[in-house]
Amino acid sequence: MNIQALLSEKVSQALIAAGAPADCEPQVRQSAKAQFGDYQANGVMAIAKKLGMPPRQFAEQALAHLDLTGIAAKTEIAGPGFINIFLDPAFLAKNIEAAVASDRAGVEKVSAPQTIVVDYSAPNVAKEMHVGHVRSTIIGDASVRTLEFLGHKVIRANHVGDWGTQFGMLIAYLEKQQQENAGEMALSDLEGFYREAKKHYDEDEAFAERARSYVVKLQGGDEYCREMWRKLVDITMTQNQITYQRLNVTLTRDDVMGESLYNPMLPGIVADLKAKGLAVESEGATVVFLDEFKNKEGEPMGVIIQKKDGGYLYTTTDIACAKYRYETLHADRVLYYIDSRQHQHLMQAWTIVRKAGYVPESVPLEHHMFGMMLGKDGKPFKTRAGGTIKLSELLDEALDRARRLVAGKNPDMPADELEKLANAVGIGAVKYADLSKSRTTDYIFDWDNMLAFEGNTAPYMQYAYTRVLSVFRKAGVKESELTAPVVIQDDREAQLAARLLQFEETLGVVARDGTPHVMCAYLYDLAGLFSGFYEHCPILTAETDALRQSRLKLALLTAKTLKLGLDTLGIETVERM
């Protein structure tokens, strides 16, 4: 049930009947305060201005045409021309009834599902995942889960860094150390190898030359180099898969679409861009000059797509990647969860993609950028020694802290149940702390805040869910035994009911904008409204059995909505805490 969409359609019809153009924007929004109703139509003033009419006069004309019979109890004009809409309790009750009967809490699947490619996580081969991968992985996965829940076909694309000069270095150094069987190495060994290989590459010109030759051999399909490369990729992705499972992230080995996938396309891309007059030779390199981007001198910026030595760049790969996602994967929309520092690079690649006609304008390419994870000192989150924090170590600490926290509250809980609860709380806390912040801003990583049982945190939300379940346990009834109709009488019942019915709208915003913090805010607000309802509207001691059943249905739908909402975020729920 999408009330906002229903009201937008009705208000639109009224505005057009009052003289507004057919493409007018009703701007129906959820009201910020109960005194302004459940929804407000804010588009009147802009339309009235275009028509040269006083806004209130136009609002009155529109209101005369607005038929919300069976939907709104009343409508009113506020301020300079806002239309406030108060939903009818009978309308709320009818739709709550339908939502309770639905295993999707009343959320309908989209009528026109799209094929959506979501590019996220993208760790590098031969390196262990670190905290810098957290935001892309967690936010991207929440986006994927939301889109799939709404009925879209989602293609996960893990654009791993599995190509480039680093492989020449690694293969050369492994050979030097006679460590040809890379398959037996743990990833931590590979990280040590990487550091040593880089040191040799920087300090030993002969070694660097050999490393570069191995890159050429690898690109040329040399079997020995390819075999070593495959081992490096395999070790890395096996380790990453363990991390994904710990994080409750849906990525699998089948979702790996690394940089190497696009290698065969690169010569053709360069040749085609030359043939189309987009790419030219400049100082031995192949360059695309873009009027849309200026250098310091105010001249069109040159984007290199092939170096003097014949090597390709990340831009070339990203051009091929976008082309592949449209032509081969048949994407209707492509979302990239990549940090904000890559914005100009992506914009340049996509400008070339559009000019070359590889992806039509009708297929959005969206950079869902995000800020950095900071320590309490406001600087990038690092170890005390200033090093990068491994993701596995961060998750270990989350589990340790959560284990101590839940053991303190549940001293008699069996060990296996305690471990399961600690995992749900610890991993959930790390994820929710990230997801509950706007992705476009930096955020402070703070263990005490994220593991608190108060405020907009995972432990609070998980506890809120168990609290609703406990009402049912105390009631001693099954869902199938709730046969009395839903009735909405008290204001707190109405507020909770209206918020429950806004679940689909909230999912729609997250799907459109890639903003899981909107879902976190919704669920936190919902939990707060349930608390107010629970305190002021007796459930188990309601005046009549019919009222008791009605309120139990509201509690049931709250539990369903909290669970489904947290699931779209990848946050586990538990039965008791």
Curated annotation (Swiss-Prot):
<protein>
    <recommendedName>
        <fullName>Arginine--tRNA ligase</fullName>
        <ecNumber>6.1.1.19</ecNumber>
    </recommendedName>
</protein>
<dbReference type="Pfam" id="PF00750">
    <property type="entry name" value="tRNA-synt_1d"/>
</dbReference>
<dbReference type="InterPro" id="IPR035684">
    <property type="entry name" value="ArgRS_core"/>
</dbReference>
<dbReference type="GO" id="GO:0005737">
    <property type="term" value="C:cytoplasm"/>
</dbReference>
<dbReference type="InterPro" id="IPR005148">
    <property type="entry name" value="Arg-tRNA-synth_N"/>
</dbReference>
<dbReference type="InterPro" id="IPR008909">
    <property type="entry name" value="DALR_anticod-bd"/>
</dbReference>
<dbReference type="InterPro" id="IPR001412">
    <property type="entry name" value="aa-tRNA-synth_I_CS"/>
</dbReference>
<keyword id="KW-0547">Nucleotide-binding</keyword>
<dbReference type="InterPro" id="IPR009080">
    <property type="entry name" value="tRNAsynth_Ia_anticodon-bd"/>
</dbReference>
<comment type="similarity">
    <text>Belongs to the class-I aminoacyl-tRNA synthetase family.</text>
</comment>
<comment type="subunit">
    <text>Monomer.</text>
</comment>
<dbReference type="Pfam" id="PF03485">
    <property type="entry name" value="Arg_tRNA_synt_N"/>
</dbReference>
<dbReference type="GO" id="GO:0006420">
    <property type="term" value="P:arginyl-tRNA aminoacylation"/>
</dbReference>
<keyword id="KW-0963">Cytoplasm</keyword>
<dbReference type="InterPro" id="IPR001278">
    <property type="entry name" value="Arg-tRNA-ligase"/>
</dbReference>
<keyword id="KW-0030">Aminoacyl-tRNA synthetase</keyword>
<feature type="short sequence motif" description="'HIGH' region">
    <location>
        <begin position="123"/>
        <end position="133"/>
    </location>
</feature>
<keyword id="KW-0067">ATP-binding</keyword>
<keyword id="KW-0436">Ligase</keyword>
<keyword id="KW-0648">Protein biosynthesis</keyword>
<dbReference type="GO" id="GO:0005524">
    <property type="term" value="F:ATP binding"/>
</dbReference>
<dbReference type="Pfam" id="PF05746">
    <property type="entry name" value="DALR_1"/>
</dbReference>
<dbReference type="GO" id="GO:0004814">
    <property type="term" value="F:arginine-tRNA ligase activity"/>
</dbReference>
<dbReference type="InterPro" id="IPR036695">
    <property type="entry name" value="Arg-tRNA-synth_N_sf"/>
</dbReference>
<dbReference type="InterPro" id="IPR014729">
    <property type="entry name" value="Rossmann-like_a/b/a_fold"/>
</dbReference>
